[in-house]
Amino acid sequence: MLSDKQQAMVSIFEKHVAAEVAGDLETTLATMTDVPHLHNIPTMIGGYGRDGVRAFYRDHLVGQFFPPDVKMERVSLTVGDDQLVEELVISFTHTRKIDWMLPG
């Protein structure tokens, strides 16, 4: 059972992911802390601070996040008191350039 704080974190996370997929940059950023940081392990790119994360999302993610046939299957969701970790299996047809995941 999740605490109220943990449930609030999950709700914000779900809003964040929905905004990413919908291409809504402002809502995506509104779900983040005042000094967000984003680090994508596969390509070692991302951003730090509101301006850096905004630029990364604008140039690489929001509105061009995934091809139309993307499927996301949650493997696990671990929620602590101050962090949330989601493990996913993502599948899609590589029909366009996706710099942050598969460069070139």
Model regions: which residues?
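C-terminal and inter-domain tail/linker signature
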Residues: 1-104
